[in-house]
Amino acid sequence: MLYHLLYPLAGDVKLFNIFKYLTFRTIYAMITALLVCFVLGPWVIRVLEGLQARQVIRTDGPESHLQKQGTPTMGGVMILAAIVIPTLLWADLSNQYIWTVLFITIGYGLIGFVDDYKKVVEKNPKGLSPRQKMFWQVLLAGAVGTFLFLKPGFNAQLFVPFFKNFHPDLWFWYIPFVTLVIVGASNAVNLTDGLDGLAIGPVAINAATYMLFSYVAGHATLSAYLQVPRVAGAGELAVLCGAMVGAGLGFLWYNSYPAEVFMGDVGSLSLGGTLGAIAVITKQEILLVIVGGIFVIEALSVIFQVGSYKYRGKRIFRMAPIHHHFELKGVAEPKIIVRFWIITIILALVAISTLKMR
């Protein structure tokens, strides 16, 4: 919005010429997102407390979690506001990729909101059924996959890090592949959101990593030099990624141990889906497995646990997702959280290193 209002006036007011710089708008999207969280945070927490939107803690989980009983949840609405508002203010709103990602951000946020509202406000413990949630997730992700597949100039090739000449064309299978990436990322983040700050920290790190890759993908010279897939217009997603980083840090202000508020499904489903959509548009889907390694490990721990119990009658972990396994082994919650953040930072550095490893 500010870009469209002020940049056209740059001929008369030279100061407004700064709005053409992507780096400037990305930095201020990040700062704006932080401010949105700081301004809205206390109010959102009070409203959630007034609605009795409080987290219900499982009695079969770690005993230390019982003290979290009654903590407000659905704080993801704050995150959504802190992503959407700065993006609308600082991004070039004529860019189709911005609206494509916001479609997933808001759409998945609505799915999570309805599920949370039914569970914690209407006191319906089932919320949306898994089948209902999956239906809407697949529908929205499939719509994005179809849009990209039919978009002129956007190819259906899969780019694999470390292999500069290996670009298999997925053709029609690109649509289910996009669906898998977005839905998988969404649910992986959702499974990770089990400790104070455990999910939002890696999400912010992932967003910062994709902020860099979005900028490179949209830059003709840099993408050619680094042999990164060139996606004209994808650079604008750096602004949205910047907003995600700011929103993540702002929410962490309230969600760090001991948490004053939880993000709920409205936050986790939306954030994961957003990362998946950005990965797809920047042609860095495989990279998400690297930088989002913590999310992958958390999801796989659940899959292996369920599969092992179903077919062998035995559990691999004391409890899944794997962060609960470490809790039951006596590792303190803050230590698990910080260690997972450290691992994510290392994985992000590995992901960034692929820019020079072709």
Curated annotation (Swiss-Prot):
One of its GO terms (molecular function) is UDP-N-acetylmuramoyl-L-alanyl-D-glutamyl-meso-2,6-diaminopimelyl-D-alanyl-D-alanine:undecaprenyl-phosphate transferase activity. It is a multi-pass membrane protein. Pathway: Cell wall biogenesis; peptidoglycan biosynthesis. It comes from the Bacteria. InterPro entries: Glycosyl_transferase_4, PNAcMuramoyl-5peptid_Trfase, PNAcMuramoyl-5peptid_Trfase_CS. Keywords: Cell cycle, Cell division, Cell inner membrane, Cell membrane, Cell shape, Cell wall biogenesis/degradation, Magnesium, Membrane, Metal-binding, Peptidoglycan synthesis, Transferase, Transmembrane, Transmembrane helix. One of its GO terms (cellular component) is plasma membrane. Belongs to the glycosyltransferase 4 family. MraY subfamily. Catalyzes the initial step of the lipid cycle reactions in the biosynthesis of the cell wall peptidoglycan: transfers peptidoglycan precursor phospho-MurNAc-pentapeptide from UDP-MurNAc-pentapeptide onto the lipid carrier undecaprenyl phosphate, yielding undecaprenyl-pyrophosphoryl-MurNAc-pentapeptide, known as lipid I. This is Phospho-N-acetylmuramoyl-pentapeptide-transferase. It comes from Pelobacter propionicus (strain DSM 2379 / NBRC 103807 / OttBd1). The lineage of its organism: Bacteria, Pseudomonadati, Thermodesulfobacteriota, Desulfuromonadia, Desulfuromonadales.
